[in-house]
UniProtKB/Swiss-Prot annotation:
It catalyses: Exolytic cleavage of the (1->4)-beta-glycosidic linkage between N-acetylmuramic acid (MurNAc) and N-acetylglucosamine (GlcNAc) residues in peptidoglycan, from either the reducing or the non-reducing ends of the peptidoglycan chains, with concomitant formation of a 1,6-anhydrobond in the MurNAc residue. Its EC number is 4.2.2.n1. It is an enzyme of class 4 (lyase). Its main location: membrane. One of its GO terms (biological process) is cell wall macromolecule catabolic process. The N-terminal domain does not have lytic activity and probably modulates enzymatic activity. The C-terminal domain is the catalytic active domain. Residues 1-27 form the signal peptide. One of its GO terms (cellular component) is cell outer membrane. It comes from Pseudomonas entomophila (strain L48). Murein-degrading enzyme that degrades murein glycan strands and insoluble, high-molecular weight murein sacculi, with the concomitant formation of a 1,6-anhydromuramoyl product. Lytic transglycosylases (LTs) play an integral role in the metabolism of the peptidoglycan (PG) sacculus. Their lytic action creates space within the PG sacculus to allow for its expansion as well as for the insertion of various structures such as secretion systems and flagella. The active site is at E314. It is a peripheral membrane protein. This is Membrane-bound lytic murein transglycosylase F. Residues 28-267 are annotated as: Non-LT domain.
Amino acid sequence: MFAHTAFRQRCARWLFATGLFLMLGACVEKPSTLERVKEDGVLRVITRNSPATYFQDRNGETGFEYELVKRFADDLGVKLQIETADNLDELFDQLGKPSGPVLAAAGLVSSERRGAQARFSHPYLEVTPQVIYRNGRSRPTNAKGLVGKKIMVLKGSSHADQLAELKKQNPGLEYEESDAVEVVDLLRMVDEGQIDLTLVDSNELAMNQVYFPNVRVAFDLGDTRDQRWAVAAGDDNSLLNEINEFLDKSQKNGTLQRLKDRYYGHVDVLGYVGAYTFAQHLQQRLPKYEKHFKATSKVEQVDWRLLAAIGYQESMWQPEVTSKTGVRGLMMLTQRTAQAMGVSNRLDPKQSIQGGAKYFMVVKDQLDDSIKEPDRTWFALAAYNVGSGHLEDARTLAKREGLNPNKWLDVKKMLPRLSQKQWYSKTKYGYARGGEPVHFVANIRRYYDILTWVTQPQLEGQVAEGNLHVPGVNKDKPAEQSPQM
């Protein structure tokens, strides 16, 4: 009897201990999404591969979305791991997997279709959906004009949702959703006449239109919309709250505006003629001098594509050009600058490139140490064009106006004032055609963007071999004569 009682007591104690252990285990909270990210030390992000979001060039990863999400990862104190999706359905499917990425940063617009899959952040970029057609073809001016047209959009996109709504009022409207294309492909198909129309957001068109000079905006479809990041619908609020706090802070401290200026502040500087001409020269002229740009790049430690962009802005890659003011050669050097840089023959393209690169680096090295990249490069370009003294005057004006004298976004607003007496009379170096360096920098940035895109590793060598397809250039059409400078 005693033994039986003791056995029952031991069992009771064992059951009590087991129950207590299970209860305590249940009380241990599961780490939040944000805590898991910090514990792992990695922020896994999924995006799209395009000029407006994310791509890789010779210097590594770049793109508007990449730059912004990299800053977020840095704020968290973790590494950034980028994954790309072939289409939007795959992107949202991967986002919802327990072992998948925790954040989607891909120029997304919130929609009812995605409501069950994701929750969206505060906005960070305002865009306008636009109907795109090919120049020379019938231009629709409203939704009714879409009926009877061959239209393709990204599968699962907000643009597909828009067309679905329009179809309710316009039953004859037909369109195709494709998961085998990206925005660049859709614009190319319009440019080449494979489809009549597509829908893209204004920022994507701005980044890509220079590659497709025949595409035009038919009309804006609806109001402006906000692009947002997304997290999985089933996740807790921890990461989303941190994202919103970061985006709000980035809006207030100017980070978002600086990124917008860096990627979109100069994209509209090329019109149709400029885009078409540059596309031609990219194939016909650049291959002759690319080796000189690359060789000089190694010596002076400056990106060869930036040197090429400067050269194009200066002479359109024409080595024997001479201006009315006496500057000559591919990099348009003055006699004085050429002598200082050791250039004996300004019409020799190799010497001209070497001299121009050396001078650019001299100017850049003379800038105040407080000016950091990427602004330092834009400041150096402005000084290369207008002179360091006038640039310093513009920085002084910026400071007087309560702006940041170390940010190109602010200083470029002041440069045009150097041509106005009420302003230049108060400066050390006086009058300057201050608008010129603003355009000079904007043009070079645009050329540089294009060169960066077309010289991605997967396209390497195609420019030099003449095999690179530059949209808008008909290879069977004789090259038009460029205007002499």
